[in-house]
Amino acid sequence: MADLYVGLVHYPIYNKRMNVIAGAVTNFDIHDISRTCRTYNVQGYYIIHPLEVQKQIIDKILSYWQEGYGKVYNPDRADALSRVLWQPDIASAVQTIVERTGKQPYVVTTDARIYPNTVSYSFMRKQLQEGDRPVLLL
């Protein structure tokens, strides 16, 4: 079975005017997605953002729940948040997976549109169930 990793990309993204922007990290991005990742045994959850100020926000929230009063108050949350890693860009997230597993991951992005390199759900399910190459879902 292949290892699954999730990455939430905050840059580069498009706003409603189709300008490239960096989105802000939210509490939801950190807490809720990390709990879902824990539930489905995702090996790592990367919050991808290039701005140092956003990394500081992520670090502060993680520190509270993993080292501060939050860890005592809700130890399950600390466990879920242990999968969260900040990376400045997608290439850095891919590199950490290569270093961890020794294998180049499939990088899969979601989109409602169909492209020439679009793969089916059944193809990716088979890769996860039968493959040994990690998958990074963005």
Where in this protein do the model-derived segments appear?
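A short, acidic, amphipathic alpha-helical segment used as a generic capping/interface helix at domain edges
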Residues: 91-98, 118-128
